[in-house]
Each structure stands twice: as C-alpha cells, then as structure tokens.
Amino acid sequence: MPKSQKNENFLDKTFTILANIILRIVPMAPTEKKAFAYYRDGMSAQSEGEYAEALQNYYEAMRLEIDPYDRSYILYNIGLVHTSNGEHAKALEYYFQALERNPILPQALNNTALICHYRGEQAIQQGDPETAEVWFDQAAEYWKQAIMLAPGNYIEAQNWLKITGRFG
C-alpha cells in the first residue's frame, strides 16, 4: 500500500474516532447529533469511493442540519463527490451554495478555480483560445480569493498566477 494511501486511511480512521467521541460528549440536540452522524457516515463512504452512499448520507445530513456554517461543509463535500464523478457543472452548483453560506471556505474557491482551469484547458484542446482565456481569468479570480484566505496554501496556483501574469 502506498504511503499516501496509508496516511489517508489513518486520517479517515482518526476522523471517524474523533467524530464518534464528539457525538458522545458534546451536548447537542438529537437532530444535530443525527445530522452530524449522517455527515460522518458520508465522509466515511466518500473516502472509500462509495459515492452514491456518500451522497445519500450528505442529503440526509442537509435535511436535518440547520446551521448555515455546517451546511456549507456538507454542500462542499457533495461538490467533491460530483467532482470525483466528473460532473463538474453539478459540482460548481454545490461549491457556489457552500460559498453562499460560508464565503471564507478557501477549498471551495480552489475547487471552483480548478474546474474553471480544466474548462480552459478543454477549450484550448478544442481550438478555442478566446474561451480558454475567459475560463483561465475566472480560475485566476477564484484562486486569488482562496490564496487571500489561506496564503500558505495553493502554491501551484500561486505559481500559475505568476507565470501567466495574473497574480496582481
């Protein structure tokens, strides 16, 4: 097993253990506990590549969760599942919904930028450099926002912004 996969499994197991502890010791209303349990189960299924099961759990968590901040993370994870499935338009919808509830979610901004960049690359392959530039400019704007929120992250994006003259 590759070391990175071992680390991911370790992190997933650690998250599950911590989530179970939180469910037991943190005072929450029964509905909040249920929502958190569905979220935890969704993350577990997602980490195992069980995307349909993950979505079912996330949708159930969304039905129960009322806190906008917590909902933003559920929406973000739904976006991740759609990204993993290659459903970029759906993923963008969920990233935008997550950002509406939590505008300082740099990972949603980063993933939105990645999809825009990917679409720019596709436009280049299709021989449409003008459309590619529009997508790349959008990617740059999302990356700048993500970098502003998390300056030490997204080094590759920072390099791309500098190389393409969009870092300013």
Swiss-Prot record:
Keyword Transferase among record annotations: no
Keywords associated with the record: Chloroplast, Membrane, Photosynthesis, Plastid, Repeat, Thylakoid, TPR repeat
InterPro entries with a match to the protein in the record: PSI_Ycf3_assembly, TPR-like_helical_dom_sf, TPR_rpt, Ycf3/AcsC/BcsC/TPR_MFPF
Keyword Thylakoid: yes
Principal place of residence: plastid
One CC-aspect GO term: chloroplast thylakoid membrane
Localization: Plastid, Chloroplast thylakoid membrane
Membrane topology: Peripheral membrane protein
Stretches forming TPR repeats: 35-68, 72-105, 120-153
Domain of life from the UniProt record: Eukaryota
GO biological process: photosynthesis
Family classification: Belongs to the Ycf3 family.
NCBIfam families: PRK02603.1
Job of this protein: Essential for the assembly of the photosystem I (PSI) complex. May act as a chaperone-like factor to guide the assembly of the PSI subunits.
Protein name as annotated: Photosystem I assembly protein Ycf3
Gene name linked to the record: ycf3
